Amino acid sequence: LRGADGQIAATDGQQALVQTGFTLPWTDDVLVPATGAFVAKVIRAAVQVSLGRSTDWIFIRADEWTVALQIEKDRRFPAIEAHVPEVSSASTTMVLAETDATFLDQAAQRLPGASEMNSPVTLDLNGAVVIRAKSGEQSSVTDLVLRNSRRQGDELKVSSNREYVRRAIQLGFRELHFRDAEAPAFCRDD
């Protein structure tokens, strides 16, 4: 929780989420542990949300519920800024049409290989936008051709965990940016 610029950043070590535009009642950076409390329906549906802080704790009040998180003073948050660069640094962008985004979010779970380690898919961004998947027992590849979507920039073929692609879609992103096939994909909504 970055008080100086009103930024909330979170990571699980594989994915990062940075949201800005918050007014926090402190000016320094505060690291708190991850918690599953925010997936609770009563917390997500809260109308009134407020924050408070003591020397050792952050308090988040969501309607009648309060979550207390102990400040982790001896730990540091990873420098994730390098992994969420400016859009201009992308060599390729996958632009998803709304209909294709909805379709991909639902279909990705049914593609082969969903239960394999890292739930892999290949994003083949050439003349078309194609999502490819194959299970270990399968000899042929299954293709999802997203006819209403397009690629901007260079042609690219990149492997990804399908759940990361789905998470981006569920967060409302319709542009996935790539610097190259080895760098992490990123989305921005500035």
Residue ranges of each PLM-predicted region?
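DNA polymerase processivity clamps
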Residues: 1-77, 84-190
